[in-house]
């Protein structure tokens, strides 16, 4: 994938960059693997905002992705590489030897016509999924499970990967994209390789409207609000807020650590992100 820079025919296009989509081989999704997607606009079942700055955006169909990779021992052929509006990564449509079709995240280096395999006997090549107990130390991984059979939860965004740095008993040690090193059960499955669409981080939206197409709404600063709306609001003229940065509910933010010290998974974290 390469990034294409647009001609500056308007202020909105001057700094706008787009993907060239050269890896895409089909524009319409597999009908049996899509479902309708209802917009939530950041609201929960009570209708209250639980995730601010969401709403609008283009209508989407949800592509059902196989994060479990539990079809062990059955080879599959990569039929197509497709665009997915619901994520930054590309997706690959697999045609299994028994006739089933599934979508997976498309890793770097995968091409139309390649053969993919899941299970303990799979080779160490991009796109194959197997338990980390069977993967050599130093391998780059994505779509990593936290519990066996739960499905991949780590490293699913475009260009991300974790590195298998060691094995200790029933645990595998992973270095995550954040720099955190943590233990994960070696029985958990992971997919070999790095998630594709690596140049996604170099995309510049160029204008506010393009963010709205994605369903992102404006972010209003607390100091620009009224006192009723935010602890930093109010004051005569422009002000700094008069206190350390906080959320609208008074929780310290911008660097303040809010992780629960008694969280059970803390004992599995060898090195926190940001630590030297």
Swiss-Prot record:
Record key words, sorted: Ribonucleoprotein, Ribosomal protein, RNA-binding, rRNA-binding
Alphabetized SMART domains for the sequence: Ribosomal_L2, Ribosomal_L2_C
Pfam entry (one): Ribosomal_L2
Domain of life of the native organism: Bacteria
Database matches in Gene3D superfamilies: 2.30.30.30, Nucleic acid-binding proteins, Ribosomal protein L2, domain 3
InterPro entries: NA-bd_OB-fold (IPR012340), Rib_uL2_dom2 (IPR014722), Ribosomal_uL2 (IPR002171), Ribosomal_uL2_bac/org-type (IPR005880), Ribosomal_uL2_C (IPR022669), Ribosomal_uL2_CS (IPR022671), Ribosomal_uL2_dom3 (IPR014726), Ribosomal_uL2_RNA-bd_dom (IPR022666)
Gene Ontology annotations of biological process type: cytoplasmic translation
Annotated stretches, region: Disordered: 222-276
Single GO cellular component term: large ribosomal subunit
GO molecular function: rRNA binding; structural constituent of ribosome; transferase activity
Compositionally biased intervals (Basic residues): 259-276
Protein task: One of the primary rRNA binding proteins. Required for association of the 30S and 50S subunits to form the 70S ribosome, for tRNA binding and peptide bond formation. It has been suggested to have peptidyltransferase activity; this is somewhat controversial. Makes several contacts with the 16S rRNA in the 70S ribosome.
Complex formation: Part of the 50S ribosomal subunit. Forms a bridge to the 30S subunit in the 70S ribosome.
Protein's name according to its UniProt entry: Large ribosomal subunit protein uL2
The encoding gene: rplB
């Amino acid at each position: 994938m390469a990034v294409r820079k647009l001609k500056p025919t308007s202020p909105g296009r001057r700094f706008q960059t787009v993907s060239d989509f050269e890896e895409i081989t089909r524009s319409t999704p597999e009908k049996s693997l899509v479902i309708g997607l209802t917009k939530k606009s950041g609201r929960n079942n009570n209708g209250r905002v639980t995730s601010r700055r969401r709403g609008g955006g283009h209508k989407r169909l949800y592509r059902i992705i196989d994060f479990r990779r539990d079809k062990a021992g059955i080879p599959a052929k990569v039929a197509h590489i497709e665009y997915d509006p619901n994520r930054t990564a590309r997706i690959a449509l697999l045609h299994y030897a028994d006739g089933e079709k599934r979508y997976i995240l498309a890793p770097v280096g995968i091409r139309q016509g390649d053969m993919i395999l899941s299970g303990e006997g799979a080779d160490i090549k991009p796109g194959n999924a197997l338990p980390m107990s069977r993967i050599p130390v130093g391998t780059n991984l994505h779509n990593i499970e936290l519990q066996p059979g739960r499905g991949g939860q780590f490293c699913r965004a475009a260009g991300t990967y974790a590195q298998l740095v060691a094995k200790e008993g029933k645990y595998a040690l992973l270095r995550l994209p954040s720099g955190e090193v943590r233990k994960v059960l070696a029985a958990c499955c992971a997919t070999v390789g790095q998630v594709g669409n690596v140049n996604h981080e170099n995309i510049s939206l160029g204008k506010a409207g393009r963010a709205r197409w994605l369903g992102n709404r404006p972010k209003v600063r607390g100091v620009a609000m009224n006192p009723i709306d935010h602890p930093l609001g109010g004051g005569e003229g422009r002000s700094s807020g008069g206190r350390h940065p906080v959320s609208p509910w008074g929780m310290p933010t911008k660097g303040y650590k809010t992780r629960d010290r008694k969280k059970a998974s803390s004992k599995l974290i060898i090195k926190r992100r940001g630590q030297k």
